[in-house]
C-alpha cells in the first residue's frame, strides 16, 4: 500500500487556495450586498439620486422590525457559513503541515460543531397565511436537521482526535 504524503500534496494545497478564494469572494459579496441593501432602503438612496432594487432575500424594510430581523438572520447565517469554511481551511492547512493528531485540530473541531448548532436553528423556515383572528389560518414551521447532523459528526470526529492524541502521547512516553 502506497503511503500518501500530505506535505507535498498539491491537491490539498489547491483546495486551500480555492477555500481562500471562496472566503474572500463570499465575504466581499456579503459586504457589498449589505451596503446596497442598507442604501436602497434608507434616505441615502434619495440623497444620491438613484433608485436601487436589491433583492437580498428577504428585502429589508427598516420600518418593519420583522424584515430587519430576517435581514440580520440572513447576515448571521452567511457569516457563520464563511466562518465554517475558514475553519475547514485551517484544518486542511494543519494536515498539510503534518499536524494530524494535534490539539489545534480538536480546537477547530470544537469551534465547528458549536457553529453548526446555531445554523440548525437559523434554518427554521416559518410561513403563515391568513389572519390569526379570522379563520382559516395556517402556520407552518420546518427545521433542517442537516446542520445538526453535521454538528454530531464533527463532535464525534473531535472525540476520536482527542483519543488519538492521548494514544500518541502514551506512545511517546513508552518509547
Regions picked out by a protein language model, each given a short descriptive name:
Residues 1-39:
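Cytosolic juxtamembrane helix and N-cap/initiation of the first transmembrane helix
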Residues 2, 49, 66, 78-100:
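Membrane-helix interface/capping segments
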Residues 7-12, 86-111:
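Cytoplasmic juxtamembrane regions at transmembrane-helix boundaries
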Residues 24-31, 77-84, 113-124, 153:
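Hydrophobic alpha-helical transmembrane segments of multi-pass integral membrane proteins
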Residues 42-64:
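Perimembrane loop-to-helix junctions flanking transmembrane segments
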Residues 56-78:
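Interfacial helix-start motif at the membrane-water boundary
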Residues 98-132:
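Hydrophobic alpha-helical transmembrane segments of integral membrane proteins
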Residues 119-175:
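Alpha-helical transmembrane segments of multi-pass integral membrane proteins
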Amino acid at each position: 500500500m502506497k503511503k500518501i504524503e500530505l506535505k507535498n500534496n498539491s491537491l490539498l494545497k489547491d483546495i486551500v487556495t480555492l477555500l481562500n478564494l471562496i472566503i474572500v469572494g463570499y465575504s466581499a459579496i456579503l459586504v457589498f450586498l449589505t451596503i446596497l441593501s442598507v442604501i436602497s432602503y434608507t434616505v441615502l438612496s434619495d440623497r444620491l439620486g438613484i433608485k436601487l432594487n436589491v433583492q437580498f432575500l428577504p428585502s429589508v424594510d427598516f420600518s418593519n422590525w420583522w424584515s430587519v430581523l430576517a435581514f440580520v438572520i440572513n447576515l448571521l447565517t452567511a457569516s457563520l457559513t464563511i466562518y465554517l469554511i475558514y475553519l475547514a481551511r485551517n484544518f486542511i492547512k494543519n494536515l498539510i503541515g503534518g499536524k494530524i493528531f494535534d490539539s489545534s485540530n480538536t480546537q477547530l473541531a470544537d469551534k465547528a460543531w458549536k457553529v453548526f448548532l446555531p445554523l440548525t436553528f437559523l434554518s427554521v423556515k416559518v410561513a403563515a397565511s391568513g389572519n390569526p383572528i379570522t379563520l382559516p389560518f395556517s402556520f407552518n414551521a420546518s427545521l433542517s436537521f442537516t446542520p445538526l447532523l453535521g454538528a454530531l459528526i464533527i463532535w464525534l470526529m473531535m472525540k476520536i482526535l482527542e483519543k488519538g492524541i492521548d494514544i500518541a502521547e502514551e506512545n511517546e512516553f513508552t518509547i
